[in-house]
Amino acid sequence: MAAEDFLTIFLDDDESWNETLNMSGYDYSGNFSLEVSVCEMTTVVPYTWNVGILSLIFLINVLGNGLVTYIFCKHRSRAGAIDILLLGICLNSLCLSISLLAEVLMFLFPNIISTGLCRLEIFFYYLYVYLDIFSVVCVSLVRYLLVAYSTRSWPKKQSLGWVLTSAALLIALVLSGDACRHRSRVVDPVSKQAMCYENAGNMTADWRLHVRTVSVTAGFLLPLALLILFYALTWCVVRRTKLQARRKVRGVIVAVVLLFFVFCFPYHVLNLLDTLLRRRWIRDSCYTRGLINVGLAVTSLLQALYSAVVPLIYSCLGSLFRQRMYGLFQSLRQSFMSGATT
């Protein structure tokens, strides 16, 4: 790889090869040219720490989401619409595991870098980005339907969950396939190392800007607007009705929104600012670039951690997962206690 740790190298734009190595959302911004002046170089996370953090997130992701997926498959006949959507979120987080695994392998073994591996890594990353947020939107929609039509049975059926999950998956597949079209293996003209880069010929800069713009609009602004709409509608319905589970519904709304804003919102805001900077809609400077790119490096790790931890938290919102996970932990506890006494 051209960057072996979270390095942010800023060079002049006029006669340089503008580059941002977006590996699973971890932005390594650098502009390569034979005659350039370096503005600033900031080390955010050392190489060994970087690999260790990604590996830890990978393990937590696989174990946690694998456990939830196992519980669903074992008791899928009892699943409702929310449970189907939560399963989609867990499986989607496993997609990020594939991207993280490919990224770590390319860090450790640069010789294996190929166009196919580059496209695989970025495809599963964008699939995670789009499918995750649209799945959360679908969860908010089902929550609204369950509250607004609490006397009806159709919002609880599996068929609604499968329809919404399929729709979110279709949108994510189209957007992810578009994002990885020009991803390929190239050689850094300075370090002579292989790396993954969007290679669209003379249109490379425009293409990269297009990908980032679509990511900001379709992966953040539109879903955020839908989240606000559905949870606002749910809140209004809860306030004007006398639901027995009124306090519980409010708690779910606060929990889901709070988790999204803590783990994902900072990265998306910085990604939006970075896109505006590249479009020259805000004033460009080395200081501004430094702040944005350091922030992107840190918040992208937070977003990756979200994929590993939040599905387990979301599992508590679905009755199937909550009851079965509680039963599983009780069985493990009893087995441990009986083994300790013998």
Swiss-Prot record:
Keyword terms of this UniProt record: G-protein coupled receptor, Glycoprotein, Host cell membrane, Host membrane, Membrane, Receptor, Transducer, Transmembrane, Transmembrane helix
Pfam families documented for this protein = 7tm_1
Specify the glycosylation sites in chain numbering: N18, N22, N31
Give the membrane topology, semicolon-separated if more than one: Multi-pass membrane protein
Q: Which family does it belong to?
A: Belongs to the G-protein coupled receptor 1 family.
Q: What does this protein do?
A: Receptor that signals constitutively via several signaling pathways including PI3K/AKT as well as mitogen- and stress-activated/MAP kinases. Promotes host cell proliferation and survival, modulates cell migration, stimulates angiogenesis, and recruits inflammatory cells, both in expressing cells and in neighboring cells. Maintains chronic activation of NF-kappa-B via interaction with host CADM1.
Q: What is this protein called?
A: viral G-protein coupled receptor
Q: Which organism is this protein's natural source?
A: Human herpesvirus 8 type P (isolate GK18)
